[in-house]
A protein has these predicted regions:
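Acidic, low-complexity proline/glycine-rich segments
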Residues: 1-14, 36, 88-98
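Conserved alpha-helical segments that form or flank metal/cofactor-binding pockets of metalloenzymes
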Residues: 1-3, 64-93, 160-167
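Acidic/His metal-coordination segments adjacent to aromatic residues that form catalytic metal sites
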Residues: 12-32, 93-119, 136, 167-174
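Helix-loop segments that flank and shape redox-cofactor active sites
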Residues: 19-23, 41-63, 126-142
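Alpha-helical scaffold segments that form or flank carboxylate-/histidine-based iron centers
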Residues: 24-34, 52-71, 115, 140-153
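Internal, conserved structured core segments that host functional sites
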Residues: 103-158
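Extended, helix-rich structural scaffolds rather than catalytic motifs
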Residues: 175-183
Length: 183
């Protein structure tokens, strides 16, 4: 009850603070899911590095891949600080299918315009979700990392928007391809 009062008063919990196991487990599960999703998002983006049209888009896909994998590693690090699983155990669980990641990463992307649509829509949704979590986050390390992740996800969303608008205002064929991907 005192812990809930502390949280309700805007208290911030650090890794070495006393906390109920239910809180520790809930925070861990949430961060592990977020880390897994960032990792899988990076792998999805990675697949488009050689397929992206032109050097600029290839470099952009490479930079985004690095960002997503970097987010995952930061998140795995703070999840491990909760002393429920090590980083290695989390990776093994992910690769062996024992833990989860956001559903969108279960689907294959078949065309460049599909990739653009996914990049924009998923990054926009992730940004909105992460901003809401940031506002209400009581776990200090996660809140600090979210600040960085949110800044970079904003860049990713704007990049997706730029690519989507470029296709939408391109040739009739490009416009139709982009519209089909959005649909």
């Amino acid at each position: 009850e005192k812990f809930e009062e502390f949280l309700n008063a805007g208290g911030v919990v650090e890794p070495n603070d006393a906390m109920p196991e239910s809180y520790r487990n809930a925070v861990f599960r949430f961060i592990e899911l977020h880390a897994n999703s960032e990792y899988m998002g990076g792998l999805t983006e990675r697949d488009w590095i050689p397929k992206a049209p032109g050097l600029h888009r290839k470099l952009t896909a490479l930079a985004k891949t690095q960002d997503e994998i970097g987010h995952a590693h930061l998140l795995y690090m703070i999840a491990a600080d909760l002393q429920i699983k090590t980083r290695e155990e989390m990776m093994v669980d992910l690769l062996e299918g024992r833990t989860h990641f956001h559903n969108v990463f279960h689907y294959r992307v078949h065309s460049w315009t599909d990739q653009i649509a996914v990049a924009y829509l998923v990054d926009a949704a992730a940004l909105a979700s992460q901003q809401a979590v940031f506002r209400n986050c009581s776990y200090g390390p996660y809140k600090r990392i979210l600040r960085r992740v949110i800044a970079e996800e904003g860049f990713h969303m704007r990049n997706g928007e730029e690519m989507m608008l470029l296709m939408a205002h391109g040739t009739r064929t490009q416009h139709e391809m982009m519209q089909e991907s959005i649909n």
